[in-house]
Amino acid sequence: MIPQTLEQLLSQAQSIAGLTFGELADELHIPVPPDLKRDKGWVGMLLERALGATAGSKAEQDFSHLGVELKTLPINAEGYPLETTFVSLAPLVQNSGVKWENSHVRHKLSCVLWMPIEGSRHIPLRERHIGAPIFWKPTAEQERQLKQDWEELMDLIVLGKLDQITARIGEVMQLRPKGANSKAITKGIGKNGEVIDTLPLGFYLRKEFTAQILNAFLETKPL
């Protein structure tokens, strides 16, 4: 069922909280892979199916009619994020005039339904649990941090300084090669303004940033 309101979406998300991947997959008649080595997107697909996500294209939000993006957040036993969170691919060409206000990153992060999930590898995939959903919109300070990082990184892209981009740049968001291997090639702008072959780059939220979102939710949650 495709949720028609935010309340319906949250209700559906709350109804699967506490289930294991195996329980939910059996309910939806979806086979469970032995692990995620060859099926990295399986958990996201499982939750999209369970919640009725509509986006056929990754350029849109998962629940575009509600203005909501769905993000899974693998956490360890202490409740800390295990990995960075992919947001969107960076526009390496045809990016002149692009501003934070109309960027894909801002669009994707304007309203997020976070689904924390058990991510520790010693737990068999079928036995990992789904956590309580978190509806999140960036605070003014978080938006400032995201905008600052985005502008700094986009400046390097637009000026043809791709070779100067490292994962260390950015307070809460970083740029990293996106792709299962280094054979994925796309077009970018070189230092002299020429079109060059380069690796696709993706914007990723740092673990410290998503940990802050988790902690804020836990602090406001009634006991």
Curated annotation (Swiss-Prot):
SMART domains: MutH. Pfam families: MutH. It comes from the Bacteria. It is found in: Cytoplasm. InterPro entries: DNA_mismatch_repair_MutH (IPR004230), DNA_rep_MutH/RE_typeII_Sau3AI (IPR011337), DNA_rep_MutH/T2_RE_sf (IPR037057), Restrct_endonuc-II-like (IPR011335). The keyword Flavoprotein does not apply. Keywords: Cytoplasm, DNA damage, DNA repair, Endonuclease, Hydrolase, Nuclease. GO terms for biological process: DNA modification; mismatch repair. One of its GO terms (molecular function) is DNA binding. GO terms for cellular component: cytoplasm. Sequence-specific endonuclease that cleaves unmethylated GATC sequences. It is involved in DNA mismatch repair. NCBIfam families: mutH_TIGR (TIGR02248), PRK05070.1 (NF003458). This is DNA mismatch repair protein MutH. It comes from Haemophilus influenzae (strain PittEE).
